[in-house]
From Swiss-Prot:
GO molecular function: ATP binding; muramyl dipeptide kinase activity; N-acetylglucosamine kinase activity
Residue numbers of Phosphotyrosine PTMs: Y30
Organism: Mesocricetus auratus
Positions that bind ATP: S45
Higher taxonomy: Eukaryota, Metazoa, Chordata, Craniata, Vertebrata
Family: Belongs to the eukaryotic-type N-acetylglucosamine kinase family.
Enzyme Commission (EC) number: 2.7.1.59, 2.7.1.-, 2.7.1.60
Protein's name in the database: N-acetyl-D-glucosamine kinase
Record's keyword terms, sorted: ATP-binding, Immunity, Innate immunity, Kinase, Nucleotide-binding, Phosphoprotein, Transferase
Pathway involvement of the protein, from the record: Amino-sugar metabolism; N-acetylneuraminate degradation
Assembly notes: Homodimer.
Length: 61
């Protein structure tokens, strides 16, 4: 089996959210989902969230 290509992606997300693992990121994701369910436009808008995710992916370069 080869190297998992998602390892760098996962690590970038963990670093961005300052969490040690997948379980740590759940708190952030639950908060976003809860806001979206309550109609919060920021939580519902991928366009507004995308910049932060892209930054997290490119910080390690």
């Amino acid at each position: 089996a080869g190297v998992d290509p998602l390892v760098p992606l996962r690590q970038a997300m963990f670093n961005y959210f300052q969490v040690p693992d997948r379980l740590g990121i759940l708190t952030h994701l639950y908060r976003i989902a809860e806001g979206a369910q309550q109609g919060d436009p920021l939580s519902r808008s991928w366009e507004l969230l995308k910049e932060g995710f892209l930054l997290a992916l490119t910080q390690g370069r």
